[in-house]
């Protein structure tokens, strides 16, 4: 398995200071993907401004960001919140690029359509207005989700999902006051916000591209295991309840998806949506993998025997690959790196 040092060694060519002298903004910097993305941007020579939530109720630990090499010289941390989009102005002004990674919703909560539109859609659009107003931002990368393409009624009959497919959310958006449960509300927020971003791009001439990752797994620099890693590793404790509401059949390594964000930002050919998924696997392969490679956890190979086994739907990253991007990590590394990191940090 690859430790963080070995992961970094893979990218000597990557670290050619492409971003030297350039300033970019990453929203939601305390999170899993954003913190890893910040680490890679700093390595590439960029100066980074990142935002964390300003609400005292959601005070975020940023010690892992401050501990990054070159953070003292090249990382600035701003307080901002999607419910107050103007608070992003100072962080964005002077940047050449913005990575909209912050997630304005709690996966476990319920939301009305009105709340989703006000916080996620309108908040994001006002941030895009800030990008226009800055006169310096050349490109914006919005982190959507594969869920914005995979929630369709005939999914079992579909062999492949690509960027032309959008999740079907009409049933959830007929009434503004309608309460939408956790996972569907997340999907609705991603679909509506991504569509709004791309429409804004067309109408205002601001270059906006989107990334659609599935479950993101791998090592982490956050103080605690991220939700996606916790879901993937919950199988070790025998608690499969966390897995049942998640499509655990497509995944991508945290390093690959972070580098894909940088790739589409730097690639002039990148336009529109980009699915970023490296492996499709039957859910039942995960307990088998852990049982065979980590026998100390005593995970039964038939742990998911009560869940119907079926072939995964292929989540196609052909568009991203056709532009020259390459995935570096396979199934064993995606989950093996997560286990190794969790063990090293004392969570397993």
Curated annotation (Swiss-Prot):
GO molecular function: oxidoreductase activity, acting on the CH-OH group of donors, NAD or NADP as acceptor
EC number annotated for this UniProt entry: 1.1.1.415
GO BP, sorted A to Z: alkaloid metabolic process
Alphabetically ordered keywords of this record: Alkaloid metabolism, NAD, Oxidoreductase
Enzyme class: oxidoreductase
InterPro entries: Epimerase_deHydtase, NAD(P)-bd_dom_sf, NAD(P)_dehydrat-like
Signal sequence region: none
Catalytic activity, reaction form: narcotine hemiacetal + NAD(+) = noscapine + NADH + H(+)
Pathway: Alkaloid biosynthesis
One of the Pfam families matching this protein, by short name: Epimerase
Its biological purpose: Oxidoreductase that catalyzes the last step in the biosynthesis of the benzylisoquinoline alkaloid noscapine. Converts narcotine hemiacetal to noscapine.
Similarity field: Belongs to the NAD(P)-dependent epimerase/dehydratase family.
Protein name: Noscapine synthase SDR1
Organism name: Papaver somniferum
Gene designation: SDR1
């Amino acid at each position: 398995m690859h430790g963080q040092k070995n992961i970094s060694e893979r990218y000597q060519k990557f670290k050619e200071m492409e971003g030297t002298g350039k300033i970019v903004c990453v929203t939601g910097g305390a999170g899993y993907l954003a913190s890893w993305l910040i680490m890679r941007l700093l390595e590439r020579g960029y100066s980074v401004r990142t935002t964390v939530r300003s609400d005292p109720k959601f005070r975020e630990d940023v010690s892992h960001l401050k501990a990054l090499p070159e953070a003292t010289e090249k990382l600035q941390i701003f307080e901002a919140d999607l419910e107050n989009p103007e608070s992003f102005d100072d962080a964005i002004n002077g940047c050449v690029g913005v990575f909209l990674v912050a997630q304005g919703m709690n996966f476990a909560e319920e939301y009305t359509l009105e709340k989703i539109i006000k916080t996620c859609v309108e908040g994001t659009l006002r941030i895009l207005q800030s990008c226009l107003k800055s006169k310096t931002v050349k490109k914006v990368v919005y982190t959507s989700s594969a869920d914005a393409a995979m929630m369709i009624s005939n999914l079992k009959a579909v062999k492949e999902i690509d960027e032309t497919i959008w999740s079907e959310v009409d049933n959830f958006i007929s009434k503004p006051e309608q309460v939408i449960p956790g996972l569907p509300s997340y999907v609705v927020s991603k679909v509506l916000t991504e569509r709004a971003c791309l429409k804004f791009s067309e109408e205002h001439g601001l270059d906006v591209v989107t990334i659609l990752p599935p479950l993101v797994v791998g090592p982490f620099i956050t103080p605690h295991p991220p939700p996606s890693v916790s879901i993937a590793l919950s199988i070790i404790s025998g608690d499969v309840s966390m897995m049942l509401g998640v499509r655990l059949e497509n995944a991508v390594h945290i390093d690959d998806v972070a580098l894909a964000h940088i790739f589409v930002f730097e690639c002039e050919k990148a336009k529109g949506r980009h699915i970023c998924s490296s492996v499709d696997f039957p859910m039942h392969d995960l307990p088998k993998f852990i049982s065979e490679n980590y026998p100390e956890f005593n995970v039964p190979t038939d742990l998911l025997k009560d869940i119907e086994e079926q072939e995964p739907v292929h989540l196609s990253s052909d568009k991203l690959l056709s532009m020259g991007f390459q995935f570096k990590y396979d199934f064993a590394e995606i989950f093996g790196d997560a286990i190794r990191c969790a063990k090293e940090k004392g969570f397993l």
